[in-house]
Amino acid sequence: MRRAWLALLLVFFAVPAMAEEIGSVGYRFKWLGPNDKIVVEAFDDPDVPGVTCYMSHARTGGLKGAVGLAEDPGEASIACRQVGPVDASKLDKLRSPHEVFSERASFIFKTTQVTRFWDKKRRALVYLVYTDRIIEGSPRNSISVVPVGER
């Protein structure tokens, strides 16, 4: 029984990919706690070596932000690029759609997610970033397309 609970917790808290913070800029001064900022992060597609995505999103500061209780705005931008060789023969076996990145955007209920689609006809990887909540999400989204191989 303990193993079942542990496995459930691991699945619940599993993260498809880890992002590396590239940098940030402050956009709103806060008297107490860190300033609100726009963060630029990079993560590699875990299933497609040679593709890296860069994502920018706002991070709320202040006292709530300092202790992890703030809710970040549900807006993000993404740009994915081929940064190395991609084995095009393996792309037809990819799950599509497939979540490749997820990050908490509030204490419990809100996440920013990146989902990858494989457009077989056009030989392109499409990455969609959006924010959702347990009850309702946001229609704000951004996509990036990485053309792969010969047609």
Residue map of PLM features:
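Low-complexity intrinsically disordered segments
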Residues: 20-22, 31, 86-151
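Hydrophobic side chains in beta-strands
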Residues: 42, 55, 82, 117, ...
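N-terminal secretory signal peptides
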Residues: 20-79
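A structural signal for the main folded, soluble domain(s) of proteins
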Residues: 10-11
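Structured domain cores in non-transmembrane regions
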Residues: 58-107
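Bacterial N-terminal signal peptides that target proteins for export
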Residues: 1-6
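N-terminal signal peptide c-region/cleavage motif recognized by signal peptidases
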Residues: 14-16
